[in-house]
UniProtKB/Swiss-Prot annotation:
The gene is AEP2. Binds to the 5'UTR of the OLI1 mRNA. Required for translation of the mitochondrial OLI1 transcript coding for the mitochondrial ATP synthase subunit 9. It is found in: Mitochondrion. This is ATPase expression protein 2, mitochondrial. One of its GO terms (cellular component) is mitochondrion. The lineage of its organism: Eukaryota, Fungi, Dikarya, Ascomycota, Saccharomycotina. GO terms for molecular function: RNA binding. One of its GO terms (biological process) is regulation of translation.
Amino acid sequence: MMVDFSPSRRRMGTQELSLKPQVETPGIKLLAVMFCRYHLIRQLKQVQAASRTRYAHSVPQSRPTLKERLAALHEKQQLSLLPPDAVKRVSENNPAVLIDCDARTLLQLFLAALQTDPQKTTLSELLSQEEGFSVFIHRLLPTYTPSSDLKHLVSKDGTTALLQKLYGFYREQFADAPIGRPSPGRLHDANSFARWFMAESKLRLARTVFAELVGNPTELAKLPRDTETIITLLQLHLGAKHIFWRDPGNSVGRGGQLFTPAHMAVVTAYNSLGEETLLRLLRLLQSDPQWKSVCSPDLDRNIILALAFHNRLDLVHAQAARYYAPAAPGHGLPSTPLLPDGALVGAVVTAFAFKHQLAQGLAIAYQFLDRFTHLPNEHELWKIIFTWLARRHPTGSQGAALYDEAWSKMRTRYAEHGQPTPYDYSIARASYRIVRRDSSLRRVRALLNDYMSPLYQQPAVAPRDRLLLLKCQAHIVGRLVRARRNSAAADFVDQWALDSEARSHLLEHIAARASSRTDADDDDAGDGLYLTGAPLW
């Protein structure tokens, strides 16, 4: 049988496909081959047509995007003609305006707006004064101290790039260091830049800023006698920034074992100028009359942390005792008329707790509380104490005694001042970790009744507070059900459920616990975490 398909031709692009007469070929096999080739060519042509269609539609769609970019650039240029309040308002309402600007566009935009300031008539007059850049920084970023305030201006991971633009522009304007000691405005700018870079864990950049704007950190006598500058020196070169410390044992797990992460912040190396340099600085501050004027509680707090970094806990104790006891004969540190605050006392707790001597640190902190009836920022002290109790909590009766003493002293201090104990999430979270680890139903009930009850008076509860509250309640419910006190668990839910949704979750938890009848230790799933679907920490 002979079949002639010669008139049939198909094209795929530039390649011609034809089926020539086949002689003595079975008809079914030939028809199958023809069918497959026909559909293959048809599909290829459909793909080509779709590609041409997409290309045709892509050209006109790019034009509005180009127009939008031109309009955005025009908007950036027009901002320079607005008064400072308008520039601030536009930048807050439309942060994207500042994201893609280069250094010159971003910075000149605000400098042009500063010309409308009645106190600075011209830009040249503004830049001729060293404090001009401080004014510029205040206008650019009104709340500039923590670098997290920069994150709404830039895209993700772009904060450091913006800081480098700011610093590069600053060096262009004030390239030459002034003769003699830096002015207060220049020191203010140097400390701001150095702390910005430290907040981004860029220690090398921060140290470069300090060396270029302040001076050689090893030449202590030539450094300016300025409190904030000495604090920056302690944090950059003498170990006072404790978030950069390498922690040999960060947290206590079940059974008392320690979890040991590598360190608490991602930095290459947090090296120091050495203990001798720190002690020379300490002698200057304690004995030189010209240096005594820079002393402050914040400076002493950083000195305490720097001493702890160099394992000089004896000097930490002596430095702290200057506030509440006569001078120690061994070290000869004079007493001080300064009033400590909660952050300073918290630094003492951090210094000892980091070296796994939490009990000694708490004992010193309680001496401060006995000596001073009122401490400024005392709430910060309690946050630090309970955070370290959760991280360094000893097992057994010793850990329970430390927690009970701290809990009692905190409530007593606020009661003596006629104030209710204020709720704080970090304290509640740390306390729950402690009492849950101790499997103490009494302490969990006290945490819920005495500390977390103000949440019921709030019109809206934050999600993290609600989750922590649900965890505490689920822990109590689980303990009651394991003791086969299902009715008591149901009564507890009726009394303490925050809302109808929480009540239904807890009732489901009762049913699940009652059906399992497990006597195993509580875990995250057993405490009701599976009901919320979100981790607590």
